[in-house]
Amino acid sequence: MTIIVTGGAGFIGSNFVFHMLNKYPDYRIVCLDCLTYAGNLSTLEPVMDNPNFRFVKESITDRDAVYKLFEEEHPDMVVNFAAESHVDRSIENPQVFLDTNIIGTSVLMDACRKYGIKRYHQVSTDEVYGDLPLDRPDLFFHEDTPIHTSSPYSSSKAAADLLVLAYYRTYGLPVTISRCSNNYGPYHFPEKLIPLMIANALNDKPLPVYGTGENVRDWLYVEDHCKAIDLIIHNGRVGEVYNVGGHNEKTNLEIVKIICKELNKPESLITFVGDRKGHDMRYAIDPTKIHNELGWLPETKFEDGIKKTIKWYLDNREWWETIISGEYQNYYEKMYANR
């Protein structure tokens, strides 16, 4: 079995690469990643010498490069993690999100059509559903919840999802889609909430929280997500969407306070900043379908997952300290200064 994993040098993609090589030692995993700011080749060092692993530095938007890789590897499956994924960056520069998330997906779809594939899996997000009101905790996103996007990022992911389903209906391409809640865990790029707060707290820097911090997110430990995708690509029904959630709803402010407590840092570091444009209020996923059909349930309680995540960042300071220098530092100053 040969699987092309696009975006495999990023956060969720790299964790998926590790999961698959560990669970299926006979599988060949080919990582296709153009190494944007969020892709880090050092993340993949533990598997670089594995004879069943190959890394290819190319963009999914490069049709010639993608076709060449398909001709060389004859993949059985493609799992597409490659995406621009940070909402704030999509507000600043939407075009790169349209290029990667929509055009890149179309290139992969065409390659799958041209060369044949047993399964194409699109890794998507619950953000395509929009948001839920804070005063309705009984409401959850289901697979048939209408798409109602709020940001250029979520709009680009929704467009890609629709394209994937169109290729299934029009061309009979064997596709599946997963829509997940917010992931956390090792190798998470430090622009996102949890790693940003861990890094800042360790350096006794302000902890910037948008608005009042009341926005609610459902948190999913990345290894649980990888196990869900593993089940979907092997046993999921073709043409179906599966919601993958963690049953760990927390306000952003709760998350930051938990991190302060775990690191023994004062809550006085918390600094409220101007809210994000179009900030979604609440995300909450109902994963009943994937549980009923594939037997998946999230295994990691948030209290345990956040401890493991913090320990990883304490044990791997060099990894994230290298990242938060240079381009990221310029971006951070732009996003949080004078707000």
Placement of each model-derived feature along the sequence:
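The catalytic Tyr-centered alpha-helix of NAD(P)H-dependent dehydrogenases
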Residues: 137, 149-156, 186, 190-194, ...
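N-terminal Rossmann-like NAD(P)+-binding domain of SDR-like oxidoreductases, especially those catalyzing
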Residues: 1-183, 308, 313-316, 322-339
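A glycine/serine/threonine-rich, flexible loop-to-helix segment
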Residues: 47, 135-136, 190-198, 274
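C-terminal substrate-binding subdomain of Rossmann-fold SDR/epimerase-dehydratase oxidoreductases
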Residues: 3, 29, 58, 195, ...
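Residue-level recognition of oxygen-bearing side chains
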Residues: 65, 96, 103, 189-193, ...
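Residues that form or flank phosphate/diphosphate-binding pockets in enzymes
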Residues: 12, 38-39, 64, 188, ...
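Short aromatic-enriched loop/helix-cap "lid" or pocket-rim segments at secondary-structure transitions
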Residues: 41-44, 132-135, 188-191, 255-256, ...
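Hydrophobic alpha-helix immediately C-terminal to the catalytic Tyr-X-X-X-Lys motif of short-chain
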Residues: 159, 163, 167, 197, ...
